[in-house]
From Swiss-Prot:
Reported function: Binds the 23S rRNA.
Subunit and interaction comment: Part of the 50S ribosomal subunit.
Gene name per UniProt: rpmE
Protein name: Large ribosomal subunit protein bL31
The organism's place on the tree of life at top rank: Bacteria
Obligatory cofactor(s): Zn(2+)
GO biological process: translation
Keywords, sorted A to Z: Metal-binding, Ribonucleoprotein, Ribosomal protein, RNA-binding, rRNA-binding, Zinc
Binding site for Zn(2+): 16, 18, 37, 40
GO cellular component labels: ribonucleoprotein complex; ribosome
Record bears the keyword rRNA-binding: yes
Organism: Baumannia cicadellinicola subsp. Homalodisca coagulata
Family label: Belongs to the bacterial ribosomal protein bL31 family. Type A subfamily.
Length: 75
């Protein structure tokens, strides 16, 4: 192998917003800040959060139906 062509690896910490710290190695020489990790992501924890989208769907349907009505009037 040739010398001095491989990147240097540093031991860093990936810090999640929930407080979980994940030690890892990277060529990046600084710590990473994560939004979610396996300790707090709903898929891994099994705690699914239901979002009430009824208002959003109704608003979309209302806008969409108005645009269809307007296009039919122009024809």
């Amino acid at each position: 192998m040739q010398k001095n062509i491989h990147p240097k690896y540093f031991e860093i910490r990936a810090i999640c917003s929930c407080g979980n710290i994940i030690p890892t190695y990277s060529t990046l020489d600084q710590h990473l800040n994560l939004d979610v990790c396996s300790a707090c992501h709903p898929f891994y924890t099994g705690k699914q959060r239901r979002v009430n989208t009824r208002g959003r769907v109704e608003r979309f349907n209302k806008r969409f139906s108005l645009s269809i009505m307007n296009s039919k009037k122009k024809e």
